[in-house]
């Protein structure tokens, strides 16, 4: 469980530890909720003179929410209801709480524990994988997390001079450059695993990039560089290290659709299938959690009730591209409903 949770009789207090936790807060919070958090607010005197910005603990009645994924911030806008006595005139004023990694938020109502744990289990895989895809011309490095696969570095080969003496196809100085960057990125991102991907003819030319405490898996792909990153995802190597981004399930959905088996539900059929307990696995694009939050809450509730497996698929992933073509939501069924 990535969130630190303290439960009281009529409140739940949560500390955000990863960006994924902000998705969870976005789904939990509703307009009308009273929330408390530390924030910064400008202090003014009775005659309007400014005394600067001060850190203060405020209770804010939620009006609306705005999620900024690139910044890793959830902005909660609302009306100040509870504030320290020295902050004169704050009551009834608008204020925005910016909740990010490390922030603690107290929500003044009880929250269904099963619903909360389902969200955490679904959205908050803490696994991070560094993928290093090597070709003769360049190396592409990507970070794979629960939110998808992001390209974080490209290293060009500035030493291409034909085949190296001794039979090597890759210049050692190029490999040294790659190793240096990978070690630096490992220090920054602290991945759980490292995947080195390249063509079979190059694999013997690439020595192990040893990073203390990080297991390394070497895989052969048809092409290195950026294409190799996507091939690693498509071929299920991320699943093998525990990071499931939904490709296998989406691929099976496409196969069942092509067969006309009747074991796939799309659109409004999904709600009918959920109400009948017919859904085995449901895949949803992550962007729907933000764009259609209320609908997402209903779907998650139904998955919990019927014990359907829920998989959130990153929009920019290979599986996400396929799922986009199906409307962003699809379900594999336990049995036909028509």
Swiss-Prot record:
Pfam families in UniProt: eRF1_1, eRF1_3
A Gene Ontology biological process term: ribosome disassembly
Gene3D superfamilies the record matches: 3.30.1330.30, eRF1 domain 2, Pelota, domain A
Gene Ontology CC terms: cytoplasm
Localisation per UniProt entry: Cytoplasm
Required cofactor names: a divalent metal cation
Any GO MF annotation of the entry: metal ion binding
Main location: cytoplasm
Entry keyword set: Cytoplasm, Endonuclease, Hydrolase, Metal-binding, Nuclease
SUPFAM superfamilies cross-referenced by the UniProt entry: Dom34/Pelota N-terminal domain-like, L30e-like
Domain statement: The N-terminal domain has the RNA-binding Sm fold. It harbors the endoribonuclease activity.
Assigned protein family: Belongs to the eukaryotic release factor 1 family. Pelota subfamily.
Subunit-level organization: Monomer.
Described purpose of this protein according to its UniProt entry: May function in recognizing stalled ribosomes, interact with stem-loop structures in stalled mRNA molecules, and effect endonucleolytic cleavage of the mRNA. May play a role in the release non-functional ribosomes and degradation of damaged mRNAs. Has endoribonuclease activity.
Protein name per its UniProtKB record: Protein pelota homolog
Organism: Caldivirga maquilingensis (strain ATCC 700844 / DSM 13496 / JCM 10307 / IC-167)
């Amino acid at each position: 469980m990535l969130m630190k949770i303290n439960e009281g009789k009529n409140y739940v207090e949560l500390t955000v530890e990863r960006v994924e936790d902000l998705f969870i807060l976005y789904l939990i919070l509703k307009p009308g909720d009273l929330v408390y958090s530390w924030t910064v607010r400008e202090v003014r005197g009775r005659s309007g003179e400014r005394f600067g910005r001060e850190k203060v603990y405020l209770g804010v009645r939620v009006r609306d929410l705005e999620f900024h994924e690139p910044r890793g911030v959830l902005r909660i806008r609302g009306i100040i209801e509870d504030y320290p006595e020295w902050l004169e005139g704050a009551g009834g004023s608008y204020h925005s709480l910016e909740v990010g990694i490390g922030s603690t938020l107290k929500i003044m109502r009880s929250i269904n524990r099963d619903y909360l744990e389902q969200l955490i289990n679904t959205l908050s895989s803490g696994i991070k994988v560094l993928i290093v895809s090597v070709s003769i011309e360049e190396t592409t490095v990507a970070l794979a997390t629960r939110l998808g696969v992001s390209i974080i570095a490209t290293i060009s080969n500035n030493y291409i001079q034909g085949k190296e003496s001794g039979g090597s196809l890759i210049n050692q100085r190029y490999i040294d450059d790659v190793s240096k960057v990978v070690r630096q990125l490992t220090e920054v991102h602290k991945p759980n695993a490292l995947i080195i991907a390249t063509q079979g003819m190059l694999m013997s030319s690439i020595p192990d990039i040893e990073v203390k405490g990080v297991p390394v898996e070497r895989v052969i792909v048809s092409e290195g560089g950026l294409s190799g990153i996507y091939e690693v995802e498509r071929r299920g190597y991320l699943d093998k290290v525990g990071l499931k981004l939904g490709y296998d399930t989406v691929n099976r959905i496409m196969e069942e659709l092509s067969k006309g088996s009747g074991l796939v539900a799309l659109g409004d059929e999904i709600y009918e299938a959920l109400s009948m307990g017919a859904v085995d696995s449901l895949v949803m694009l992550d962007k729907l959690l933000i764009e259609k939050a209320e609908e997402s809450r209903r779907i998650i509730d139904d998955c919990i009730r019927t014990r359907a497996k829920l998989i959130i698929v990153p929009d920019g992933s290979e599986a996400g591209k396929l799922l986009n073509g199906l409307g962003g939501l699809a379900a594999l069924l336990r049995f036909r409903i028509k």
